[in-house]
């Protein structure tokens, strides 16, 4: 058996050489190199097994882009980022235009980005004056008659009544004199000491003519006596009433 093995090997070599001679175009690539040995890595079960643990040092974050804003509020209030019709709310210096920039601009020349449209408003919108119902002239008087003036409002206060909140009274056109005004006011407020004989404004000036009455002002009604003490006229002397610009408040009247 030992002598037959070399013969078989020689026979095999002859057969392989014969096959290669019969098929000269066939190419047999060389065998692949052997695989490297497998390295077994032990399993790491906790973060302490990693020498590069992330909790030891703070991770390096990417650098932020420089935008020129300190915080998010400066970014939101930057007028350079407003587009469309909202950018018309600010002028070229970034200052707000007020109500002129908040109006609906399309009511004037449309919402458009075309430079040919003058859609920038630099002042508040001025409302167009409405035409009067009655045209002044002879024709209006013939059709509608003479227009009477609107009644003036007076806030009446009783002298010495510190709890009086005021009584509204309208000076109608049929009141032609101060005596007629005194009679109508007496029926309206029922004064304490008697009928109304004298009327004072907030500057403690006596009203002697109907033309001196200011629409919406306060007036103190007395029966001829002087005004009461200051502590009983606090509501009457409050500052919410309209007075004439030429009137002055003398300080000697406010001595308690």
UniProtKB/Swiss-Prot annotation:
It comes from the Eukaryota. This is Doublecortin domain-containing protein. It is found in: Cytoplasm, Cytoskeleton. Keywords: Cytoplasm, Cytoskeleton. The keyword DNA-binding does not apply. It comes from Toxoplasma gondii (strain ATCC 50861 / VEG). The gene is DCX. GO terms for biological process: intracellular signal transduction; microtubule polymerization. Gene3D superfamilies: Doublecortin domain (3.10.20.230). SMART domains: DCX (SM00537). Its main location: cytoplasm.
